[in-house]
Amino acid sequence: MKLRALSLALVAPLLLAAVPAGFTPIFDGKDLAGWHVSQTNHHGNSKGWTVKDGVLLATQDRPGNGGILLTDKKYRDFEVSLEVNPDWGCDGGLFLRSNEAGDAYQVMIDYLPGGSVGGVYGEGFEALKDGKGQLVNPDWQKHWKKDDWNLLRARIEGDVPHIRVWLNEVPLVDWTDSANHAKGGATEGMIALQMHFSNQQTPRWKPGGFHRFRNIAVKELPR
C-alpha cells in the first residue's frame, strides 16, 4: 500500500506538469466530476467511461455501442488541451461547442485506416457535409507518436468559428468557416469526447479497444 501511494505521489506532479500555463484543468484524474454522459442516444448511450490512475478511459460497454461524454459547463471562445493515446482501430473525437445531442464542430481522433487526427468535421451539420464529411484533413501521421501519449490542442473563437488545431505543438489546422453552421447558430456549447458507434457495415471501433485521455484543460478567451 505504501509503495502504491508513493508511486501515485510521484506520478501526480508529472500529470499536472503537462497542463499548459494559463489553462485550467477540467478533469481531475480521479472521477467524472464536471462531466456527464449525453442524455440522448444520437451517438449511442455507452456507460463505458471510467477513470484509472489519472486517465479517462473510453470503451464500448457492449459491442458497437458508442457515446459521448460532455462537460457540465458551456464555453464560448476557448482553447482546450489534452493528451490522447487511443488503440489502433478506434474512432473518437473532440467536440467543440457541442449541444447535448453531440452536434458540434469536431476535431477528429479517428485512429484507424483512412482516419484523420486533428482534422475538422461538421458533426450533425448537414450543410457542411461533402462526400467525406471532412472540412479539413491535415497531414498528421508524421507528427504522431505511435503507442504513446500525444498532445492535442484546439482553439475556437468568433461567432463565425475560426478553428486552429495543433498536434504535439505542430500547427495542423488554421480554418475559418464560411458561416456559423452550428445548430441554431449557437456561439457556445460544451466540450465533449466521443467514442464512435460501430457495426459490420461501419467498423469504427476495435472490439475491446480503448481511447485514453488525460490532462484535459481549458483556457477561456476574452471577447
Identify the residue ranges that each predicted region occupies.
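Positively charged n-region of N-terminal signal peptides that target proteins for export
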Residues: 1-5
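Bacterial N-terminal signal peptides
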Residues: 7-17
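Carbohydrate-interacting regions of secretory-pathway proteins
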Residues: 19-223
